Amino acid sequence: MVALTAVVLAAVLAGVGWLVWTNGGAEHWRELTDDRFVYGVPWGTLLAVALVTAFYLFAQRGLWSWYDPLTLPFVSWSWFYPVGVLTSGFAHGSAGHIVSNMTGALAFGVVAEYAWGHYPQRRGHTIRDSLLAPQESRFSSPGARILLVTAAMFAVALLTGIFSLGPGLGFSGAVFGIAGFAIVTKPRAAIAAVVASSALSTLYQALADPVVRGTVSVGSPSPPTWANIAFQAHMLGFVVGAMAGIALLWARRDELASVTVFFATL
């Protein structure tokens, strides 16, 4: 079932992508990203998603047990358990958990990385250089700026793993950080990212679990589903991302579209 779901989902996404790409999408994407991404690809976001997915597949044994990964060693049980504190921001509790976080990371990550850019901006202009060309600053080359995107995402994940209250698990703190950065710097594009992320998650759920059955069970009351959500980690990630976005706008002397940001946050 897992293989069939993955094949169908990949086929649907490939078909939609091919349709858009061959009907003017390629030219529009090149025009949009020519001075923002190296070869038009958000490398930093893709690298982060690939590494987190690899952690789920190999460290958590998700490749062998997709729906029932290894989780207990990676939970941030306590500050006296450093392994959990360091890994909780990258581990996930289920297939749906990682799919949801990775689709969100991809959708918002593209927007955030576009706002950051692989090429430095000075006085409203983009300075384009080759990927590994010598730079006046070690952080101004495209290669370094790409790695900074991945490093920033991982830093927020680690931060939320350290300061979240109670046992935690998941990359969602970093996803909310990426979203906060994207909403502040590119609010309209962030709204489109919400739609894209929701559409991908809905498509995956429809393929993975097309039939939903409701049952009535007899027993003692149980906590609601939202009781297991680390709201404080989400909020911390969002605030850190938003502050980073404000700092970037201030450094570039760009204006903050406060009204648009307000409605994008809603």
Region locations from a protein language model:
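A detector for small-residue-rich transmembrane helices and their helix-helix packing motifs
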Residues: 2-266
